[in-house]
Amino acid sequence: MKTVSIFGSTGAIGQMIIDVILASSDSYQVKALVAKSNVQLLAFQAKVVNAEMVVIADVGLYKELKDLLFGTNVKISVGDVGMQMAASLNVDYVMMAIVGIAALVPMVYLISAGVKVIALANKESVVCGGTLLFNLAREKNVNIIPVDSEHNAIFQILHSNDRENIDKITITGSGGALLYMDHDQMRNITVQETIKHPVWKMGKKISIDSATMVNKSLEIIEAYHLFSVKSEKLDVIIHPEAIVHGIVSYVDGACIAFMSVPDMKISIMYTLSWPNRMSMLYKKLNLASYHQLTFMKPDINKFPGIRLGFEILRTSNIHANSIIFNTANEVAVDAFLNRKIGFLDIVNVIYSTLDMVDCLHINSLSDILECDSIARRVASDIICKLN
């Protein structure tokens, strides 16, 4: 039986991970569940998977969680201390599903503790942690396996094939909820319309990122670090059906594509069983049921957010600009979700923040967090002025 801990268990991806584990309950023992503030769901999850330990990041919710778990043997911890305790547990797999840059510090804790495998469903920690994160992972001999469908697809292709003669790595994107809308329609789009993704079941933040296509820029930077590939060998193509998740092209003209039904549980299953595979628990791909598969070049005029990743990878200060980009996006998306700015303002806030913030040296975790803090203040000020 394999042991596993889940960081971010109450989020959209975390709940899918729980579903996969429950469907294979004889194969996994859950050591720890970590959540931000959803105590009701965390307590329920702890009971159904028989977790040994739970951590709630919000220390003010300790008593409520304790009451909910009264009569069980579940250990309860809180805050940063609890996070470090959960990170230090000896487990076979850690599933990292915390949203945003909030995952970065726990990632450092996990890598520093020398966990065997981190299944990573968080791109922001890679974008902001950059080479510092991956250098530490190499030093500690920690395997980082991407859960996101696109990077998981590329990882699986490269795991079984030649890595030396790659000509291009292509990340696909569904195009999000607003693919076929024009700017006039986008100008007054509502939050509810934006988060209705046509293919994927996702959380609010990533649904907005998908709609702006900023998600593809984050993924381009993520791929740059995950696969140690130059930016000119990275590409994006829009594929609304979301059946092809990634393509690796080789110098001889051959291309290997990874296909599956658009279900995150497939990549979750792979990361939970890596380097092996478990039997399919969910719907399998039937290509005959698809009359056609569509591919198109991204419209960078309509969706300028898709350019950001490539532009940042061409700058002399990739690490700092990646942090500023990610932070500005987090602030802008939050403002849109709270109806403080319009949809089209999101990318404008990102570009304005990149123009106004300059973090010169990123040599440590504290440098990353300081740059994030500065960019957060500037982006917030920009949004205040828009109002």
UniProtKB/Swiss-Prot annotation:
NADPH binds at residues 10-11, 13, 38, 122, 124, 203. The keyword Nucleotidyltransferase does not apply. Its EC number is 1.1.1.267. One of its GO terms (biological process) is isopentenyl diphosphate biosynthetic process, methylerythritol 4-phosphate pathway involved in terpenoid biosynthetic process. It is an enzyme of class 1 (oxidoreductase). The keyword Lipoprotein does not apply. 1-deoxy-D-xylulose 5-phosphate binds at residues 123, 149-150, 174, 197, 210, 215-216, 219. One of its GO terms (molecular function) is 1-deoxy-D-xylulose-5-phosphate reductoisomerase activity. It comes from the Bacteria. Mn(2+) binds at residues 148, 150, 219. Pfam families: DXP_redisom_C, DXP_reductoisom, DXPR_C. It catalyses: 2-C-methyl-D-erythritol 4-phosphate + NADP(+) = 1-deoxy-D-xylulose 5-phosphate + NADPH + H(+). Its cofactor is Mg(2+); Mn(2+). Keywords: Isoprene biosynthesis, Manganese, Metal-binding, NADP, Oxidoreductase. Pathway: Isoprenoid biosynthesis; isopentenyl diphosphate biosynthesis via DXP pathway; isopentenyl diphosphate from 1-deoxy-D-xylulose 5-phosphate: step 1/6. Belongs to the DXR family. Catalyzes the NADPH-dependent rearrangement and reduction of 1-deoxy-D-xylulose-5-phosphate (DXP) to 2-C-methyl-D-erythritol 4-phosphate (MEP). This is 1-deoxy-D-xylulose 5-phosphate reductoisomerase. It comes from Ehrlichia ruminantium (strain Gardel). The gene is dxr.
